Amino acid sequence: GPISLDPAAMILHYGQEVFEGMKAYRAVDGRILLFRPEENFKRLNLSNERLCIPLVDVEKCVELTKQFVNLDKDWIPSAPDTSLYLRPFIFASDPHLGVRPGKHYYFMIIASPVGPYYPEGLDPVKIYVETEFVRAVKGGTGFTKTGGNYASSLKAQAVAKEKHYTQVLWLDG
């Protein structure tokens, strides 16, 4: 459900947050499977380390995610090419104006039934080659899954959509 944040919460001013994405789906025999949860939580920790967020216990997160999915298994669709999308995320919640790593964090998982990521399926997609804007630079945060990386891509995505392209290929200068 909704959460309450102080207007000075560090996430709102300094963007100290990371997220991951993974899927739970139903196998043909009805079993519920998670796709590479260990790898997702390891990648979450790579992002955490880069943004000075405490690391999570990968094994514990995988186990708790399995329990969470089992509790919400009725939300896992059974139609072809569907799944339950899981979005674990962590953000600095302490109210503080001034740049420093947070001291208090929320860790949550959102779950949502989804269809195919690309509605085109296996059909070819039109790719817009971005030459003006840069998404990542050597030594930067481009390898992390953090909101700022996606926010900075919105302008190029809007241009691509306006020109009827499906996705952006970043040349990064």
Provide a role label for each language-model segment.
Residues 1-64, 68, 96-173:
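Helix-start/capping segments and mature chain N-termini
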Residues 71, 79-101:
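Non-catalytic, conformational "gating/processing" segments within enzyme and secreted inhibitor domains
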Residues 75:
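Active-site phosphate-binding and catalytic loops of NTP-dependent enzymes
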